[in-house]
Amino acid sequence: MNAIWIAVAAVSLLGLAFGAILGYASRRFAVEDDPVVEKIDEILPQSQCGQCGYPGCRPYAETISCNGEKINRCAPGGEAVMLKIAELLNVEPQPLDGEAQELTPARMVAVIDENNCIGCTKCIQACPVDAIVGATRAMHTVMSDLCTGCNLCVDPCPTHCISLQPVAETPDSWKWDLNTIPVRIIPVEHHA
C-alpha cells in the first residue's frame, strides 16, 4: 500500500514540476501578435477558401498589415469586408479584385441536387463554414444564409450533384445605385 502512495506522490510532483516549467516557458517565450492583424482577421469572413491567393484568412490579414497587400481580394466578404478594412487602415476603398465590374457580382450559393446525393459527407468535410447539413447515407442540404459561395464543396462530390447558383435578387438584396436615378429639384415657394 505504501508503494502505491509513493507512486501517486511521485507522479503528482512530476506533473507539478513539468506544469511549472511549461507555465514559465509560455510566458518567457511568448510571441506578441500584431493587434492590426488581429483586427483584420476578425473582419475577414473566416471561410478559409483561398480565393484571395492565400491559404486562409489569417495569412491574408498578415500580408495586408505587414506587406501592404491589396484589401480587395476577399471574394466571400465582398465589398462590405473591403470597406471595413479600408476604414480600419485609413486607406481609400478599392474596387473589388477581378474583372472590372461596376456592380458586385451576384452572390453565389451551393445547391445540392438531393435526388442524386448519396450521403457520402465529402461536401460536409470540405465546407469551411459548416453550411451543409446531413448525415451519412442521407441526403444533404445547404443552408443558404451561411454559404459563402467559396466553391470548395463542388469538386469533392463524387456524383457531381453540387452546383453554384446565384441568389435571386429581391428588393432587400438588390444593390440600388441611387446615383443613376434622375432627380429633379422642384423649388418650394414660401408664403408669409
Swiss-Prot record:
Region (Hydrophobic): 1-26
A GO term from the CC aspect: plasma membrane
Keyword Iron-sulfur attributed: yes
Any one GO molecular-function label of the UniProt entry: metal ion binding
Tagged with keyword DNA repair: no
Chain ranges of the 4Fe-4S ferredoxin-type domain: 108-137, 138-167
Disulphides: none
Annotated keywords: 4Fe-4S, Cell inner membrane, Cell membrane, Electron transport, Iron, Iron-sulfur, Membrane, Metal-binding, Repeat, Translocase, Transport
Co-factor(s): [4Fe-4S] cluster
Chain sites annotated for binding [4Fe-4S] cluster 1: 49, 52, 57, 74
Residues engaged in binding [4Fe-4S] cluster 3: 127, 147, 150, 153
Ranges where the 4Fe-4S domain occurs: 32-91
Cellular compartments annotated: Cell inner membrane
EC main group: translocase
InterPro entries, sorted: 4Fe-4S_dom, 4Fe4S_Fe-S-bd, 4Fe4S_Fe_S_CS, 4Fe4S_Ferredoxin_RnfB, Elect_transpt_cplx_RnfB/RsxB, RnfB/RsxB_Proteobac
Binding site for [4Fe-4S] cluster 2: 117, 120, 123, 157
Pfam family, one: FeS
Free-text comment on the cofactor: Binds 3 [4Fe-4S] clusters.
Enzyme Commission number(s) of this protein: 7.-.-.-
Family recorded in the similarity comment: Belongs to the 4Fe4S bacterial-type ferredoxin family. RnfB subfamily.
Subunit structure: The complex is composed of six subunits: RsxA, RsxB, RsxC, RsxD, RsxE and RsxG.
Function in brief: Part of a membrane-bound complex that couples electron transfer with translocation of ions across the membrane. Required to maintain the reduced state of SoxR.
NCBIfam families the record matches: PRK05113.1 (NF003475), rnfB (TIGR01944)
HAMAP family linked to this entry: RsxB_RnfB
Entry protein name: Ion-translocating oxidoreductase complex subunit B
Organism per entry: Escherichia coli O6:K15:H31 (strain 536 / UPEC)
UniProt lineage: Bacteria, Pseudomonadati, Pseudomonadota, Gammaproteobacteria, Enterobacterales
